[in-house]
Amino acid sequence: MKSFLDLERALFEQLADMENKLLPKLTELRADPIIASFVHELYSYAMDKDGNVKYSRLLQKIDRTTANALQNMQQELLEELADDVYAEVRGEYPLSVTAFDQLNRIDAVKAIYGMTDLKMAMREAKLIREHFDVWADTVFAMVETFYGIKSLSKISVQHNFEPQLYHQRLTAGLEAGKRLSLDVLRAMPVERAVEDITRYMEKKDKQVTDRIVFTEGTTVTEEVSVEVVKTRVKAFHTVSVKDGKTCADCKAIEAEQAANPVPIENYAPGVTAPPFHPYCRCWIDFVEVVR
């Protein structure tokens, strides 16, 4: 069986392949005057000079006809690819494939593939939901699933847990993602949101699990153990997509912050944290310390 990190790596590679397959069709879509106008307004003027999202005012300019046209075309394109892209993950681990199967618009692909900052993604999701209910929970599902996958990848590096515990940890991660959604929608500062999620996850980290150890083909069940881990977020560092497309500047920032993580109180999108440019292919990972 492949490790979760292998599957995560394969997922990003397949998503990159999906993007390459979509590019010719995206070019055709954006050649349409209505679509081109939508993309131009949404991405070129989404942020003001202070980094504040201006989707609310911009999206009011775009009528329901445009929204429906986009949704219908993107639904057709993405349904063709969704099953193949996630077949390997679906077959190996009990991930929440419902979120992946909701890939019904190009923006959702960008959300899971190039997610840079959870706070920004959730703010975008809230504003899109307000104006285009036809897209409903897509971005929310992407953020929640992504948060769960990140928590799983951390566990897989540190511990030799079995798949059933992966599933428990993913469930906790998805629940934490939903809680983070509420924190961000209440405009809670990112530091407080992180503290809130940390406290929430501390409760989830008390786990009673039957450890199964495989030795020379024999299955041995150990005694039930109680494990309590209390952590707090101390800092963060930038992580980029490993597919050869990340720019040199982002790679340099990633290397620098890997060696010297940034204190959480210095979190500043565009300065110390992604996005560093409009199509930034980075996100952040938290550094946790045991209390």
Predicted segments, located by residue:
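N-terminal leader/targeting and assembly helices and adjacent pre-domain segments
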Residues: 1-204, 220, 288-291
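Acidic, glycine-rich two-metal-ion catalytic cores of nucleic acid-processing enzymes
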Residues: 198-291
